[in-house]
Structures are given as C-alpha cells and as structure tokens.
Regions:
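A short Gly-Trp-Pro
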Residues: 1-6, 13-163
Length: 163
C-alpha cells in the first residue's frame, strides 16, 4: 500500500496530501536549477501518484514556475516540468511534468510526514555542482549526471517500494 504523505509550505498557507510508492528521500540533486530554487545544496525529490494529490488548503496561492535549462547558452530552453510553489513564502511544493502525467514529485523539504531514512544517499549532477557545495557526510554514491535507475527502480532494488 502506498505511503500517505502530508505536506505544507513554510508559512502554513498551503497544505496538501498525496500517496507515494517511492517515499525514501535518498536522491540529492545539485544541478543549478535545484540549487537556485531549492537552496544551497539542491533538492531531494520524492515520487508520488499524481491523481492522489489533494490540495487541502491554499490552492489559490499555488503558482507554477518552469525553469530555464542551460541559461545564457545557445542551448537555453524552458523546461517542460512545472515547479509548484507557495506564492506567499516561496516554498517549493512539488514538480509535475506532462511527459509523465501519472507522476508527481513532491520536494522532501515540503513533506511533514516522517519519511523513511535511506541507508545511503545518491548525489547527482556532480558536473553542475560548484566546488563550495559539499555533499552530505555518510555513505553515498555520486554521479556526474543522472543515474540510470529511476526513483521506482531504486526503491524496488532496495525493497523499499510501497505497493
């Protein structure tokens, strides 16, 4: 059975709930987009079941942002994904992409439910990380870009997939 996740923004104006089969916060992304919108070291995204999302409070305060990839280069383009955030306090809530409409990716930082603790972290986008950003201490795997395993693949390999 999927795990029920409850989340909110920092100011408390937005509250939401959803179900997740992939709730372990093991993957830290340090790409420039995640660092700019998520803070110093980047963001940790979870996997969620999109049609289970219930906005309990503050729907009118949720705004969307589509990030700019390769900003300032000839390859610059707008991402297809939408980052949903609270327009009062700027808390990043979840990411959704029309290429995978059945999925939603809540930011672990917005989740109030106690999450399972990973035995190790997967740190990705080393190639985008400035030298002054430090990976967390402890057991970890570091990738220059995205690893081959999806969130679902990783959870299943580690017997942490919530069916």
């Amino acid at each position: 059975m999927p795990m029920k996740l409850e989340g909110s923004c920092q100011c408390g104006s937005v509250e939401f709930a959803l179900e997740s089969s992939t709730p372990v916060p093991y993957q830290l992304c340090a790409c420039s987009i995640c660092r700019k919108v998520g803070g110093y070291s980047g963001s940790v995204n979870l996997g969620g079941i999109a049609d289970s999302l219930k906005i309990k409070k503050g729907k009118d305060l949720i705004k969307k942002y589509s990030a700019v990839m390769a900003r300032g280069t000839p390859d610059e383009k707008i991402c297809a994904s939408e980052r949903n955030f609270c327009s009062n306090c700027s808390t990043m809530l979840w990411l959704w992409d029309h290429h995978w409409p059945e999925l939603i990716h809540p930011f672990a930082s917005a989740i109030d439910t106690e999450l399972p603790v990973p035995d190790e972290m997967v740190c990705l986008m080393e190639s985008s990380k400035p030298a002054w950003v430090r990976w967390p201490e402890g057991k970890k795997q570091v990738y220059d870009v995205y690893p081959e395993d999806s969130l679902e693949d990783w959870h299943k390999k580690h017997n942490l997939f919530f069916e």
